[in-house]
Regions:
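Structural recognition of the beta-strand scaffold that forms the well-ordered cores
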Residues: 140-144, 149, 191-194, 242-247, ...
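Generic structural signal for well-ordered alpha-helices
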Residues: 278-282, 311-312
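Extracellular serine-dependent O-acyl
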Residues: 293-362
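Short, conserved loop/helix-junction motifs that constitute active-site signature segments
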Residues: 136, 238-239, 286-289
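A structural motif corresponding to the C-terminal end of an alpha-helix
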Residues: 179-190, 281-293, 317-323
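Conserved SGNH/GDSL esterase-like catalytic core that processes O-acyl groups on lipids
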Residues: 42-43, 164-266, 293, 302-308, ...
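N-terminal secretory targeting modules
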Residues: 2-175, 362
Length: 362
């Protein structure tokens, strides 16, 4: 049985520092203090194995807004613990598991939410012993995306094909089963998921970080990408993906100044500006990564199909430049749901994206 609580433990526990080489990290993570790594992006994670019956992690979390949780997977079973803003800035112990069989266990601890939380891991405790770190996949994948990639409102199971529930306040968010995270697991790839709800390409557009909206053009090269956490540049030499998925275009219609979604991608002048900036970002990534394969996509969340037409044009122009770009269109692309995709819809997208990448990755 897995219990996931914040209770005080009375049994003797062995403390493990976060710098222990038996811990494996994935994601854009700040190691300025190697024993207190800071997580910014949803899906950034630690993986490790241990032999024992109980496991606790020490964390220090800051919640900026929303009803948030810490995510974990123990022996393939995903679970979450609710966090409280009352503990902001305090070190707390989170019991991940107890009463397990005294045998080998595989664990992933991950940041479940995006910029509404800052997460620091401070240590691991077990009544048993740590084992060697799991081997990392050789295949590497990176994603630049929006709320769908972040798994926002994915767990609102009663709202499949419907608008989001009112005042959900992030409590249905969980990045673990977002379609891009599922796809990475399906193809056996490590993933860096650079995703944020509401993000568009340009600063001043989209919905991220009201009222001073921040776009992917200012995020894609960041370690910490939200001002509350202290902006930091990313060192691209730390991770070189084989596959880069770019999933934006959903939020770009919002001008960031009014409540109207009045940016028209069919306007020739704006279309040229948007495409030019998109291509500039891809070309920069292509140079940094020595020619990976780029998968350009949106999602099944309803939107104007002309954004996808513009992305097709971008793909063609990139190909003419010698960049390996591919355009994915889902069966129900832009037409399946007025609200965020739920788990069943993420499963659908993951299955299709997995097949698409499998066909191009070799």
């Amino acid at each position: 049985m897995i219990n996931f609580t914040m209770n005080f433990r009375r049994i003797k526990m062995n403390s493990i520092k976060m710098s222990d080489k038996r811990i494996s990290y994935s994601g854009r993570i700040n190691f300025d203090d190697e024993n207190a790594p800071v997580f910014y992006y949803a899906g950034s994670s630690v993986s490790f194995r241990f032999k024992g019956t109980a496991l606790t992690v020490k964390i220090n979390a800051v919640i900026y807004w929303g009803e948030l949780s810490l995510g974990a997977v123990v022996d393939g079973k995903q679970c979450s613990v609710k966090l409280s803003a009352e503990n902001n800035g305090r070190d707390i112990d989170v019991v991940i598991a107890e009463n397990l069989e005294d045998t080998e266990h595989n664990v992933v601890i991950y940041k479940q939410h995006a910029a509404n939380q800052l997460l620091t891991l401070k240590g691991i405790e077990t009544d048993g012993e740590m084992l060697d770190a799991p081997e990392k996949p050789k295949l590497k994948m990176e994603v630049y995306g929006d709320s769908v990639c972040a798994g926002e409102v994915i767990e609102a199971a009663d709202y499949v094909g419907k608008c989001d529930p009112e005042n959900h306040n992030s409590r249905y968010d969980n990045v673990w089963n977002s379609f891009v995270m599922q796809t990475a697991r399906n193809i056996g790839a490590e993933i860096h998921n650079i995703c944020q709800g509401g993000i568009a390409l340009f600063n001043g557009t989209g919905y991220f970080h009201h009222p001073d909206y921040i776009g992917l053009e200012s995020v894609y090269d960041k370690l910490c990408y939200f001002p509350e956490g202290g902006l930091l540049q990313w060192d691209f030499s730390r991770y070189t993906p084989d596959i880069v998925v770019i999933a934006i275009g959903q939020n770009d219609k919002h001008n960031g100044r009014t409540d109207s979604d009045d940016i028209n991608i069919s306007d020739p002048e704006y279309r040229k500006v948007w495409k030019t900036a998109y291509i500039k970002m891809v070309r920069d990534l292509d140079k940094k990564y020595s020619s990976p394969k780029f998968v350009l996509t949106t999602t099944i969340l309803m939107h104007d199909a002309d954004w996808d037409n513009a992305i097709e044009e971008i793909k063609n122009e990139l190909n003419e430049m010698g960049i390996k770009a591919y355009h994915n269109l889902f069966t129900r692309n832009g037409a399946a749901t007025p609200g965020h995709p739920r788990l069943a819809e993420h499963n659908e997208m993951a299955e299709e994206l997995t097949k698409f990448i499998e066909n191009i990755k070799d």
